[in-house]
Regions:
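N-terminal targeting signals for export/organelle localization
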Residues: 1-49
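Short, small/polar residue-rich loop motifs at catalytic or cofactor-binding pockets
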Residues: 42, 65, 139-141
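Generic structural signal for well-ordered beta-strand positions
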Residues: 56-57, 154
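Short active-site neighborhood of thiol/selenol oxidoreductases, capturing the structured segment around
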Residues: 57-80, 99
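Structural microenvironment flanking redox-active thiols in thiol-disulfide oxidoreductases
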Residues: 80-119, 128-134
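Thiol/disulfide oxidoreductase modules built on the thioredoxin-like
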Residues: 117-121, 127-174
Length: 175
């Protein structure tokens, strides 16, 4: 192999390592204030109103299957892109996973309805409160938590997540 070709390969490899290092650092920084998932911490309870004014209760100690709680803001452009990934996963999960989408940082119910009008969603859409935001330590949008069947926080993330990345976190795809 020519010396010049080796240099290009090493340079490309170094650039990939730098990119991965930056990506990992940013991901860690985004998640640092979220609830920990490396312990046996139970997810917080909540009772929130849905879009038809029914109260939905979530009690992690009563869970019998995995749950994804997705937090979004109606003004968030990344949320507009990623919520369709969540819906696609819900459609293909055959009811084996509970899904909740929780609107936060909204000014009016109409603002949330306008957001929802752009998406064909079948999961429950709940109107979150500042208490919900604080209980789940949401610092940006979109954010989500995967909660196992025992109510324990299993995974978390903030920002855009690909459909395949979410499927891996939910245990629907094995690597």
């Amino acid at each position: 192999m020519k010396k010049e070709t080796k240099k290009k390969i090493v340079s490309g490899f170094n650039q990939i390592l730098i990119f991965l290092g930056i990506f990992i650092a940013i991901t860690w920084w985004q998640q640092k204030d979220m609830l920990p998932t490396s312990s046996s911490l139970r997810a917080p309870n909540f009772s929130l109103v849905d879009m038809t004014d029914n109260v939905v209760h979530f009690n992690p100690s009563e869970q019998t299957q995995k749950t994804l709680v997705y937090f979004f803001a109606p003004w968030c452009s990344v949320c507009h892109i990623s919520i369709d990934n969540i819906e696609s996963i819900k459609q293909s999960s055959d009811g084996k996973i509970n899904f909740y989408a929780v609107a936060l940082d909204w000014k009016s119910k109409q603002e949330v309805e306008t957001f929802l009008a752009e998406h064909d969603l079948t999961m429950p859409i709940l109107l979150g409160t500042n208490e919900t935001l604080n209980d789940f330590k949401i610092g940006g949008f979109p954010s989500y938590y995967v909660i196992d069947s025992n109510g324990i926080l299993q995974s978390k993330d903030m920002g855009y997540t690909t459909e395949i990345g979410m499927r891996v976190r939910l245990g629907l795809v094995e690597l």
